[in-house]
Amino acid sequence: MALPRPTSPHARGSNRTPAIMRLVLGACVPGLLTLTWLYGPGTLLNLAWASLVALACEAAMLALRKRPPGVFLKDGSALVTALLLAVALPPYAPWWLTLVATFFALVFGKHLYGGLGQNPFNPAMLGYVVALVSFPLEMTRWPSPDSALGLPDSLREFLGLATRPDAWAHATALDVLKTDRSLTVDELFAGNPAFGHLGSAGSEWVNLAFLLGGLFLLWRRLFTWHAPLGMLAGLFAMSLLFWNGSGSDSHGSPLFHLFSGATMLGAFFIVTDPVSGATSNRGRLVFGLGVGVLTYVIRAWGGYPDGVAFAVLLMNLAAPTIDYYTRPRTYGHRKAERGFKAGD
C-alpha cells in the first residue's frame, strides 16, 4: 500500500515587494505634502513627470532584457525611485533635468546591474548626483518658502518658459554657512531669511515630516533601527565635535545639521535600502555611521553644501567590505568565519 508523502507547508510572509513599496510611498506623503505646502506644486509636477519617465525606462529596459514588463512594472520600485528623486530635486527643476536624473537612476543605477535586487548603488542617489555634477546651477535654484508659485507659474517654470530674476532663488542655510564667514551663527539665524528655528528655513519642517514617515516605517518593521540611528549618531557626533559655539568659523550646531538638507530623508529612506547597504545589524550600524560622518565632512569642508547623496554612494562602495568584517556568527560556531577555505 502506497503511503501519501505530502510536503510540509511553506511559511508565507506578507512582506512582498509591492506591499513594501506601497508602504514606502505612503510614508513619503508627509514630506511630499510639506514640500508642496512650502514651495508650491512644483514638487508634484516633478513627481508626475519622474513617474512617467521611470515607468517608460523600466518598460524599455525590461523589453531589452526580455523580461515580462507586466510583472515587474507592478512591483512599485520604479515609482519609489521616482518619488525619492522628486522630493530631492529643486521644486522648480526644468523637465529635462528630472528626465536626466530619472533616466540615469533607472537605466544606469538599476538595470545595468541586473535590475531590482542587484544594484550596488542606490539608484535615486546615483541619478541625483549625475544631475548635481552635470547641472550645478539648476540643482541649486531653491526658492524661499515665502515665494512659492501657483500652478500656472509652476508649469511655466517646469517647461522652461519663464525667466525668473536671480533674487527669486536664494541660498539655503547650508550654502550660507559654508560661504559666509563674516558673521557668527547667531547673527546668521537672526538676520538671514535662509535660517529657521532649528535649521534651514522650510527644510526643518520637511525633515520633521520625513522623520514622521520614517518612524512609521520603523514601527511597521520594514527595517531595523541600526542604519538610521547610525547615520544620525555619526552626523550628530561630528557636528558636536567640531562645533565651537556660534563663532564665525563654526560649521553649525548638531541640531542644525539634523534638521537641514536631506538628513531625515537620507536616514530613513536612503540608507535603509536593503540592496545597496550592509546586510547584518552590526554592518548596518557601521554603514549608517559612515554615511553620517561623510555627510558632515562634505558639508563642512567639501565642495557641495549637502553631502548625503555622495556619502551614500561612497558607503555603497564600502558595503561589501563592511559585510565581510561584520558577518554574524553561524549557529553552532563560536565566531563568524570569514573568507574561503582551501578546496571550497
Swiss-Prot record:
The enzyme's E.C. designation: 7.-.-.-
Signal sequence coordinates: none
CC terms in the record's Gene Ontology section: plasma membrane
Pfam families found in the cross-reference section: NQR2_RnfD_RnfE (PF03116)
Disulfide bonds: none
InterPro entries in the record: NqrB/RnfD, RnfD_bac
Topology class, membrane: Multi-pass membrane protein
Keywords from the UniProt entry: Cell inner membrane, Cell membrane, Electron transport, Flavoprotein, FMN, Membrane, Phosphoprotein, Translocase, Transmembrane, Transmembrane helix, Transport
Membrane-crossing residue ranges in chain numbering: 23-43, 44-64, 77-99, 120-140, 198-218, 222-242, 252-272, 285-305, 306-326
Compartments reported by the entry: Cell inner membrane
Any one GO BP annotation for this protein: electron transport chain
CC cofactor: FMN
Residues with PTM FMN phosphoryl threonine: T172
NCBIfam families in UniProt: rnfD (TIGR01946)
Described purpose of this protein according to its UniProt entry: Part of a membrane-bound complex that couples electron transfer with translocation of ions across the membrane.
Xref: HAMAP family: RsxD_RnfD
Family: Belongs to the NqrB/RnfD family.
Assembly: The complex is composed of six subunits: RnfA, RnfB, RnfC, RnfD, RnfE and RnfG.
Protein name, entry field: Ion-translocating oxidoreductase complex subunit D
Protein's organism: Pseudomonas aeruginosa (strain ATCC 15692 / DSM 22644 / CIP 104116 / JCM 14847 / LMG 12228 / 1C / PRS 101 / PAO1)
Gene name linked to the record: rnfD
